[in-house]
């Protein structure tokens, strides 16, 4: 059974940065739903490429079956990992329902790491991070933030109600954020 930590927060909250540090220091494999989707979009002969491209450009959510299949394949490919950080997923109730349908009984969801950060700070980070993403422009970012507020934040509230959320303020310097994240993982691994 795979240990899974969901890493959620608004676009630009530092999910990728913190996941890289957790991977390097704690041995969890970082699976970014967005990176997997972008890679699939670019893969020659992908049956989902055009569909994924349309959703990414519009800032909308890709069908859950596609995302779950990509995540499951990535976990199978790294089956000897300590655990998995799933960054940017689930993004809504449909994602969570689809995840449970496809992955129920195959994984141990340890907790949800919620990186909270003011939206204006997140947008500024995205515009200046220089990753060359097609969706790092003001128009797409506004749509992504709107999608986050309408769809993802309610799923975070759901996880909060069932006691799974561990919130860390990610507006601070990365070293401070990471120190708090390490404490969250240490507490979770003592249980």
From Swiss-Prot:
Gene Ontology CC, one term: cytoplasm
Cofactor(s) in the UniProt record: Mg(2+)
CDD domains (UniProt xref): ADK (cd01428)
Primary location class: cytoplasm
Gene disruption: observed consequences: Confers resistance to 5-fluorouracil.
MF annotations from Gene Ontology: (d)CMP kinase activity; ATP binding; CMP kinase activity; dCMP kinase activity; UMP kinase activity
Keywords of the record: ATP-binding, Cytoplasm, Kinase, Nucleotide-binding, Nucleus, Pyrimidine biosynthesis, Transferase
Xref: Pfam families: ADK (PF00406)
Xref: InterPro entries: Adenylat/UMP-CMP_kin, Adenylat_kinase_CS, P-loop_NTPase, UMP_CMP_kinase
Binding-site residues for CMP, renumbered to this chain: 95
Keyword Heme (UniProt): no
Highest taxon of source: Eukaryota
TM region(s), chain numbering: none
NCBIfam families (alphabetical): UMP_CMP_kin_fam
Subunit structure: Monomer.
Domains (record comment): Consists of three domains, a large central CORE domain and two small peripheral domains, NMPbind and LID, which undergo movements during catalysis. The LID domain closes over the site of phosphoryl transfer upon ATP binding. Assembling and disassembling the active center during each catalytic cycle provides an effective means to prevent ATP hydrolysis.
Task performed by this protein: Catalyzes the phosphorylation of pyrimidine nucleoside monophosphates at the expense of ATP. Plays an important role in de novo pyrimidine nucleotide biosynthesis. Has preference for UMP and CMP as phosphate acceptors.
This protein's name: UMP-CMP kinase 1
UniProt organism field: Caenorhabditis elegans
